[in-house]
Amino acid sequence: MKKYADFSSFKNKHIGQRCFIILTGPSLTIDDINLLKNEITFSVNSCIRLFDKTSWRPTYYLISDPLVYKSIGNELEKSDLNCPFFYSRNGIKKKINLSNALPYKALYFYHFLNFITNGKTTLGWSLDINKGIADAPSCVYAVMQIAHYMGFKEAYVIGADCNYSGPIQHSNIASYQPKVKIPKNAGNHVLKAWRSIKIHLENKNMKVYNATRGGMLELFPRVRLEEIVKEDQKWKL
């Protein structure tokens, strides 16, 4: 049996469409999530802890951090998550025995190079996720590579607060408290991932928009979530 999944069926599956990427910053609300019930959504990490608060379920889910998996793995495997579920097989270092689990190979070289040069190099990027997905200090980096591989034209991000200076750094509704202390420079490392996303997608056919309420991520055009959803609904009438 192969260690990694074959992702060929996902190539350009959503060509020209839009997606919403739900992250777990403190600005995330159930009201915002409920706006996205009819949208294509990616969610990550402790988003599974929202399932008892909403009928929304993601279209795709991803987890890449072994520490996060250690914290929520049992809940994840018992949850009613039934969408394609991407996970870093060599990062988490175990096979997840779920029928919808899709192990991918995380590529660490450029992440390591970026770290030892103190951010002076750009993080890697994979155009073919069958060959691996470039790793970064944030799981959103893997999500963006998958979304690009799938052919999405637009990606809207919510819950991307990128504020690591305050006492609250994760969503209360997602109920995730890291078991390890987050270093003070964590925000700088996460911003490296966002900067590399901007660089890699600059001349590609996928635009990123920030629909987060507040926060400190200013690398992408800001939009109001309800207006984006409302505009699309109006167009469909």
Task: Describe the function of each predicted region.
Residues 1-237:
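Metal-ion/cofactor- or nucleotide/acyl-coenzyme-handling active-site neighborhoods
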